Design a protein with these regions (language model features):
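Gly/Ser/Thr-rich phosphate-binding loops and adjoining beta-strand/alpha-helix segments
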Residues: 35-65, 90-101
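Helical lid/core segments from catalytic subdomains that handle acyl or acyl-like groups
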Residues: 57, 116-204
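Conserved glycine-centered short motifs in functionally critical loops
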Residues: 72, 107-113, 207-282
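Hydrophobic "lid/gating" helix adjacent to the active-site nucleophile
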Residues: 67-101
Length: 293
């Protein structure tokens, strides 16, 4: 995406949408809070094409295996790039288009009670493929679990937590004011997934079913995706016979202000099409077009 010259009203991370219809102008004023404008989309995905695909990718015994998470995340961010309204948000009653596409998620350092969590944020480029995204996730996870990576967002929270309570509350109120105007410096929010295009959580990895996660008034994220636990489901095959196939339920929470229902419906169809044809994720976006169906 080409860099645009920053104008008055733009944020560091986004461009103010000036030529908008009356509805989108008014909605940010009368419905100013993101958490008050949540809409929910439930989708069930057949994992059989993805299972075959990741088995092929893992055939050579690579140390960091491809998983369903990598495929779903890649398909989702490619959908966001191809459907740019999904990369919009409201802040301070204004309507913005992000300058970049990013994906945020939380890394559990180990599966144990009391284990620490760290935040990860990936920048996705039009030329990104599942291979490049897989490698970036590998680096994020390895650095986090080996505690080599300095996460400025986590460090900022630790500093605030160490202050006297009255000081930390005052500091957080000031930071929230900065957030409202898009003035938070990177040392505070550099790796905060609440500022991502897509915030994704794999609850299936801890054996929980899919649900919905709320949006937050902090940050700018307008799209949250929950991946549930895999399960066997009776489905019709191409001959009309019922057979058990592995599926996963996805729960999408979206800001209903940024796009209409028709736009979301076409976006979900594209997302599922990419999951049904995962080899497309090996192509850069300049070689992917939307399905005509």
């Amino acid at each position: 995406m080409a860099e645009q010259k920053r104008r008055w009203g733009d944020r560091r991370d986004a461009t103010l949408l000036r030529d908008v219809d009356s509805l989108h102008f008014i909605m940010g004023i009368i419905y100013p809070n993101r958490a008050d404008n949540e809409a929910y989309i439930a989708e069930r995905v057949n994992l059989e094409p993805i299972k075959d695909y990741i088995a092929t990718k893992n055939y050579e015994g690579i140390p960091f295996k491809y998983t369903f998470f990598h495929v779903i995340l890649t398909a989702l961010v490619k959908t966001v790039i191809l459907r740019p309204k999904l990369n919009r948000f409201y802040a301070n009653e204004n309507y913005y288009q992000r300058n970049k596409v990013t994906a945020g998620f939380v890394i559990k350092k180990e599966f144990a009670d009391g284990s620490e969590e760290a935040m990860a944020l990936l920048e996705i480029k039009p030329e990104s493929t599942i291979e490049t995204i897989h490698e970036e996730i590998h680096q994020e996870v390895a650095a986090c679990r080996e505690q080599k990576k300095v996460n400025t967002t986590d460090n900022s929270m630790n500093v605030l937590n160490s202050l006297p309570r009255f000081l930390s509350k005052a500091a957080v109120r000031f930071i929230r004011w900065l957030d409202k105007h898009g003035w938070c410096p990177d040392f505070l929010i550099g790796k905060d997934p609440n500022y991502s295009s897509v915030f994704i959580s794999n609850l299936g990895s801890i054996h929980l079913k899919s649900g919905y996660h709320h949006l937050t008034n902090w940050g700018t994220s307008s799209l949250f995706c929950i991946i549930g636990e895999k399960k066997w489901t009776p489905l019709y095959d191409e001959h009309g016979l019922v057979e058990m196939q592995e599926t996963v339920d996805l729960g999408l929470t979206v800001d209903e202000r940024i796009a209409d229902g028709y736009y979301y419906a076409k976006s979900v169809r594209l997302f599922k099409y990419l999951l049904e044809h995962p080899t497309l994720l090996e192509l850069s976006l300049i070689h992917i077009s939307e399905p005509t169906r």
